[in-house]
Amino acid sequence: MKNVDFVVEESDRILLIEVKDPSDPRTTETARQSFVQNLKSKQFVNVTLVPKCRDSYTYLHLMADDRKPLVYIVILSLYEHTDRPDLFVGLQERLKLRLRKEGKKKWERQFVQDAVVLNISMWNRRFSYQADRRIS
């Protein structure tokens, strides 16, 4: 099973949070560029992001911990000084579509209420009560 990085239970929903951090100062420029290329491909959504969300949901469901709506949040530590980085355009919609239909038929049950892709500054504006910052 592949699981998301964090599961946060709020009063009215459960946040499934996946963090991708190619802006880490320890990341080489080659690795960063490779990540950006991968981000543009179907592979990133289909093989990296969706299985983590689905598997995390499956675990919560089997443990009877899925009684609240689920929101999948992907935090990409890229281009922190823009509100809507070019690379994010379309990524969120591709993610939502794939979460609803992985095969030929749509899932009969939608297991995620919403999915959003944010950078850290966008996260901090939207979730100011749980601000995020780099510590290393």
Question: What are these model-derived regions, one by one?
Answer:
Residues 41-45, 121, 129:
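General secondary-structure propensity
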Residues 70-127:
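Short, low-complexity, polybasic intrinsically disordered segments
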Residues 22-77:
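Catalytic cores of nucleic-acid endonucleases
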Residues 1-11, 129-136:
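Basic, amphipathic N-terminal segments that precede the first structured/catalytic domain
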Residues 13-15, 71:
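Structural motif
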Residues 15, 25, 81:
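Flexible, glycine-rich phosphate/dinucleotide-binding loops
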Residues 6-8, 15-21:
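Conserved catalytic cores of phosphodiester-cleaving nucleases, focusing on short active-site segments
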Residues 2, 20, 40-42, 52, ...:
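Context-gated lysine
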